[in-house]
Amino acid sequence: MTHHSLKHISDRIKQALNQIENRNLAQDLWYILGEQNFQGFLPAFTVNHFCEKYHMTDKELALILLPVSACYANPTISHFSVGAIAKGESGNFYFGANQEFCTTNIQQTVHAEQSAISHAWMRRESKITEITVNYTPCGHCRQFMNELNSAETLRIHLPHSQDNLLHHYLPDAFGPHNLQIDNRLFDKKAHNLFLITEDPLIQAALDAANQSHAPYSKTYSGIALQLQDQQIFQGSYAENAAFNPSLPPLQTALNYLLLNGNEVENIARAVLVEQPFRLSYRGMTEELLAYLGDIPLDYIQVS
């Protein structure tokens, strides 16, 4: 799979930082991102440090960071890079970017807002308070964000318009409340799926399944990917009241892997743990893994 690998993420970020007018800020960002191996993430204390040092708000910093976030995009179909920054209740910044996969179906795509939000979710953020994105969110992403436990108060910032509530973009919205669902995306889960295993990859996939948000189908599903250097990345299924904007577990894991500065070519193993009540992501997962490089899938069904 040729996946944007013509340029390493560090080369793309260096190019984006060259566009920042404040050269000292650009140098500081380069140092911080380099120190953390180009993980697309800034902890709250770093965000606060930059804001104090350069006399700017976190909203202004997020807007400046959008071209950097867009460096993580893999727009192999659209050739159109979108960057997003999700700000958590913790004050952390989580980068996101669109992830596209050629030769498979277009439903495998991850949108930038989904990317930033699921990135925050995998890092165990409790709530998203703000989303900054370089283009107006599409209808798919507006609906995806409406599943959040912060949907009613979520603020969206664009280069040309800031501080708009999500419901400014999605008035009279259909959402979880229409289906009598109270537990929202980012709320704590208690699915109590159980396996006896000493394999850390299987345990990670089980943990991801137990964190999954699937109140409509009750198909709890989670995946874990192990790289050649033994790093493990989890992905949980994020279901949506409107069904189609749901984010499959593999997409969540691949996105998390990519936003951590890694490459899909380094995946060595994959385990999917699932309680397939009304659905199953096995086939879709196997299809995308085959495209990524014939990665075998260990599938474990739990009940």
From Swiss-Prot:
Keywords: Hydrolase, Metal-binding, Zinc
Organism this protein belongs to: Histophilus somni (strain 2336)
GO terms of molecular function: cytidine deaminase activity; identical protein binding; zinc ion binding
Protein name: Cytidine deaminase
Keyword Hydrolase attached: yes
Active site, UniProt feature: 113 (proton donor)
InterPro entries: APOBEC/CMP_deaminase_Zn-bd, CMP_dCMP_dom, Cyd/dCyd_deaminase_Zn-bd, Cyt/Deoxycyt_deaminase, Cyt_deam_dimer, Cytidine_deaminase-like, Cytidine_deaminase_bacteria
Listed HAMAP family: Cyt_deam
UniProt lineage: Bacteria, Pseudomonadati, Pseudomonadota, Gammaproteobacteria, Pasteurellales
Enzyme class: hydrolase
Function of the molecule: This enzyme scavenges exogenous and endogenous cytidine and 2'-deoxycytidine for UMP synthesis.
